A protein has these predicted regions:
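Short histidine-centered beta-strand/loop micro-motifs
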Residues: 18-21, 67, 73, 165-166, ...
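A conserved acidic, glycine/proline-rich C-terminal tail/linker
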Residues: 182-212, 219
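Hot-dog-fold acyl-thioester-processing enzymes
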Residues: 1-58, 104-106, 113-191, 248-249
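Small beta-barrel nucleic-acid-binding modules, principally OB-folds
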Residues: 53-68, 189-200
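HotDog/MaoC-like acyl-thioester-processing domains
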Residues: 2-6, 62-145, 201-204, 212-249
C-alpha cells in the first residue's frame, strides 16, 4: 500500500490570482484535493468512510509559501498521513519545482461518527497494513488563537456554493471568505496562514468577519450570531521587497 501520494500538477488559471501566480487559497485547495485522492487510494475516502458511518473533519490547517509558481507551470505535489493521537491525526503536504520547495502544509483531522455526532479514535480507521511515515513538514506548535478581534470588517452569508458533501461550509471556503476581506496587494504578502475550524456553518447563516493587526500579520475570526466562533485564523506577512522576491521560483 502506497503511504504517499506523489504526482505532477500544472497550475491552472482557476487557482491563480491577479498576478497570474498560484494564490494562497489555490494552493490550499489543491493540497486538499490530493489529500482526498490519496485517502481514496488507501481505502479511507469519502464513500468508504460513509459506508462505515464516518466522516473526516478538518480541525486545523497551516500553509507556508516560499515562492508562488506561475500559471501553467508544472510542479510536483506530495502528501502523506502522519502521526495519530487518539482523536486527532495529521497529514502533510509539499509543493516543489525541481528540488526547490515552494510551499508546505499540514492539516489536523478528526473522524466523526455520523450516528452519534461525536469524534471517534482515528487509529482503527486506517488500514492495519498502512505504515505511517515519520517525516513531518510545516513544523511548530499550532497557535493558541485565543480571543476574538473586536473590529468587524464585514458580514458574510454562507452560500450554497460554500457547501461540501457534509452539507456545511467547506474548510477552503472559510479561507476564501477571510482572504476576500483584504486588498490584493496584502494577499501577495502572505507567507503563512493557520486556520482553526471550530463550529460548522450552514447555508444561510450570517457571520461577522473580524480582524486585527499583529506584529507580523493579522488575526481573524468569523463569529456566528450566537456569539460562537466558527473559524479563527492567523496570517503572517512579509515586507514588500520579500513579497516580490517570493514570486520568482
Amino acid at each position: 500500500m502506497e503511504n504517499r501520494y506523489h504526482g505532477a500538477w500544472t497550475v491552472p488559471l482557476s487557482h491563480c490570482d491577479d498576478t497570474a501566480r498560484l494564490s494562497v487559497q489555490g494552493a490550499l485547495s489543491q493540497f486538499m484535493d490530493i489529500a482526498a485522492l490519496h485517502a481514496e487510494q488507501i481505502g479511507v475516502g469519502g464513500e468508504a468512510m460513509a459506508q462505515r458511518g464516518l466522516f473526516w473533519l478538518t480541525v486545523r490547517s497551516r500553509i507556508r509559501l516560499y515562492a508562488r509558481p506561475a500559471m501553467m507551470q508544472t510542479v510536483t505535489l506530495e502528501t502523506w498521513p502522519g502521526a495519530v493521537e487518539n482523536l486527532r491525526c495529521e497529514r502533510f503536504y509539499t509543493m516543489k519545482h525541481g528540488q526547490t520547495l515552494l510551499a508546505e502544509a499540514r492539516t489536523q483531522w478528526a473522524v466523526l461518527d455520523l450516528a452519534g455526532k461525536r469524534p471517534v479514535p482515528v487509529a482503527p480507521v486506517y488500514p492495519p497494513e498502512l505504515i505511517l511515515p515519520e517525516e513531518t513538514v510545516c513544523d511548530g506548535a499550532y497557535a493558541p488563537l485565543r480571543g476574538v478581534p473586536e473590529d468587524e470588517v464585514c458580514r458574510y452569508t454562507v452560500r450554497s456554493v460554500d457547501l461540501d458533501l457534509g452539507c456545511h461550509m467547506n474548510n477552503v471556503a472559510y479561507v476564501w471568505m477571510l482572504l476576500g476581506t483584504f486588498p490584493s496587494a496584502e494577499l501577495h504578502r502572505i507567507r503563512e496562514m493557520e486556520t482553526h475550524y471550530r463550529r460548522p456553518c450552514f447555508e444561510g447563516e450570517m457571520l461577522s468577519i473580524r480582524r486585527r493587526r499583529t506584529e507580523d500579520g493579522w488575526q481573524l475570526a468569523a463569529v456566528k450570531e450566537s456569539g460562537e466562533t466558527a473559524v479563527a485564523a492567523l496570517l503572517r506577512t512579509a515586507a514588500d521587497a520579500a513579497a516580490g522576491a517570493a514570486e520568482n521560483p
